[in-house]
Regions:
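Alpha-helical transmembrane bundles and membrane-interface segments of multipass inner-membrane proteins
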Residues: 1-174
């Protein structure tokens, strides 16, 4: 029989270190946006790798690819729901080293969500500034990188690392 990850041998994750890490990530995101506004605010682009990567500032009042323009209430509700879910999962996650990758992914997703939420609350748009011109990808920011990379990593972890039947038993209400 496998050990129960809800048992006392698996103490819960302490939230304070994670919250401090999230705050640090949010600060980093906001600093990059401030720097982008300072250097790109006049409409100029900075080409880092010609035909591949450049910095260009846009004000995005929607989501990726320009969808959901000016849907502020929707973004606030979705972000709040995501943060509640993330902190619920974190509060129940065992502190075992095995769950560190999952915790880190959740920290990055939370930081990205809050970073963009701050922009929406303060400016009514998100400050995006990283542009991959090679594939004409939508302009994005550091918070978007946090969310995308962490979500992709979570999918991989779920597929290849957390494969045992009881790996997520700590989320059960039993």
């Amino acid at each position: 029989m496998k050990e129960n990850k809800n048992s006392p041998e698996y103490p819960r994750t302490k939230l304070l270190p994670g919250v401090l890490f999230i705050v640090l990530l949010i600060i980093l995101d906001q600093i990059t946006k401030i720097v982008a506004v300072h250097f790109l605010g006049g409409g100029q682009n900075v080409i880092l790798i010609p035909g591949v990567l450049e910095f260009t500032l846009i004000h995005n009042s929607g989501a990726a690819f320009g969808i959901l323009q000016n849907a502020m209430l929707f973004f606030f509700i979705i972000t709040a729901a995501a943060l509640v879910m993330i902190f619920f999962i974190l509060s129940r996650t065992p502190s075992a080293r095995r769950y560190l990758p999952m915790r880190l992914c959740l920290y990055f997703i939370a930081a990205g969500a809050v970073g963009n939420l701050i922009d929406r609350a303060v400016f009514s748009y998100v400050r995006d500034f990283i542009y991959f011109s090679l594939i004409d990808f939508p302009v994005f920011n550091v918070a978007d990188i946090y969310i995308t990379c962490a979500a992709f990593t979570m999918v991989l972890l779920t597929m290849f690392y957390y494969r045992e039947e009881n790996d997520f038993s700590f989320l059960s209400f039993k």
